[in-house]
Amino acid sequence: MVSSTTPSSGEYLLEMSGINKSFPGVKALDNVNLKVRPHSIHALMGENGAGKSTLLKCLFGIYQKDSGTILFQGKEIDFHSAKEALENGISMVHQELNLVLQRSVMDNMWLRRYPTKGMFVDQDKMYRETKAIFDELDIDIDPRARVGTLSVSQMQMIEIAKAFSYNAKIVIMDEPTSSLTEKEVNHLFTIIRKLKERGCGIVYISHKMEEIFQLCDEVTVLRDGQWIATEPLAGLTMDKIIAMMVGRSLNQRFPDKENKPGEVILEVRNLTSLRQPSIRDVSFDLHKGEILGIAGLVGAKRTDIVETLFGIREKSAGTITLHGKQINNHNANEAINHGFALVTEERRSTGIYAYLDIGFNSLISNIRNYKNKVGLLDKSRMKSDTQWVIDSMRVKTPGHRTQIGSLSGGNQQKVIIGRWLLTQPEILMLDEPTRGIDVGAKFEIYQLIAELAKKGKGIIIISSEMPELLGITDRILVMSNGLVSGIVDTKTTTQNEILRLASLHL
């Protein structure tokens, strides 16, 4: 609810001051501040576990703060639900979109607040009002289209338009570009800037440092539940922000490339997948100890390559040769037996069993190998291997019985990589391995990948982050519309060259 506290000077739309929140045995927020001006885009940054989510849950009334004050447009607020916050002008666009896929766009826009004509929903008015908002924000989507037929970026636009329809003054955006193409990101940024022009205060959460400098005016950094700093972006460098986030200076974003790739271990020739639209005539070699990147725009069929190699997609033509011997992976089990491992793109939906413990998640890809002679599971060896995953992958956890869903994204990813290493692969394929992972944890993942390459593993990495590919790979295979448009040496190529190749067959 909104109290009648005396308004502040009006410099800020939102003032969260001295916010404290504790849970049993843990002080989650310790005197945290967040102040957002109108007509501004404010980055909220910190590693996973820094307190960003807890702070926002206190704002939305999901958690009740222990102490501190929250002022919105000069008046003290104390919301008890996200619905109450939304109705009072504070909205959030979540990373996991909150739309009903079976309903139309305009149904989603006005859900639970439909305009009516007598006893019936006024469909014409709903269409007109949706279209008017879309026109104002330059959103080209048919209000009558079913949401389930739209792209992720279009769904993001609907969420933003929905916030606009509530006349939101504060809009919080949580990793809004994680699944968007560069063109879609630019369109999203245009809409965000329109909201800024109209007087909104935008709180922008992202692990993509380049976006923060491209878009935001100010930044607030949290670390270990404490407020570290609020500063204008203009006076900061990327290294300074990283140092504030992690509490130390990161002298380098990527490990040194000390490894020299060896002989060819994998030869792929004219690989074509059966499912349409498909990859066509994909050819490349992978060397022992090499890190091969795969670049391309969304829709380039990068993931199709590793899924075909892993037996998830059926190939219709081409050959796969491992150590000079031609093989066929008809399914994932055959691929594992041939020494392939695949860390999938969607960590939470296809990579982990969030409500089960680290032990289960560490062993599930290799569980059949833990049966003893009488068919029972060897619990001692299972515990030992789980501990190996925790130790060798440097997983930060109280123990192997910890629910994996409670870990940070970086630690979840380490468990997944460790799980696959238990299968003793020669070829490790990673699809967007650092998506949604904070900057400190990213470096740890890069170190693990570099160490595995040094041990002779052949590694294939798909990434939408160009600095990541240029920073950790030896060569980059560029895809465009299902075709290989080039393979470049990372030492001599440029981002512009990769983007040119990625657009070659569009």
Swiss-Prot record:
Q: Which GO terms describe its cellular component?
A: plasma membrane
Presence of keyword Transport:
yes
| GO MF annotations in UniProt | ATP binding; ATP hydrolysis activity
Kindly provide the name given to this protein in its UniProt entry.
Answer: Galactose/methyl galactoside import ATP-binding protein MglA
What family does this belong to? Belongs to the ABC transporter superfamily. Galactose/methyl galactoside importer (TC 3.A.1.2.3) family.
Question: What SUPFAM superfamilies does the record point to?
Answer: P-loop containing nucleoside triphosphate hydrolases
Specify the domain of life of the species encoding this protein.
Bacteria
List the source organism: Shigella boydii serotype 4 (strain Sb227)
Give start and end of each ABC transporter domain: 14-249, 264-506
Give the EC number.
7.5.2.11
What kind of membrane protein is this, topologically? Peripheral membrane protein
Q: Which InterPro entries match?
A: AAA+_ATPase, ABC_carbohydrate_import_ATPase, ABC_transporter-like_ATP-bd, ABC_transporter-like_CS, P-loop_NTPase
Residues annotated to bind ATP: 46-53
Task: List where in the cell it is found.
Answer: Cell inner membrane
**Range of residues in the leader sequence:** none
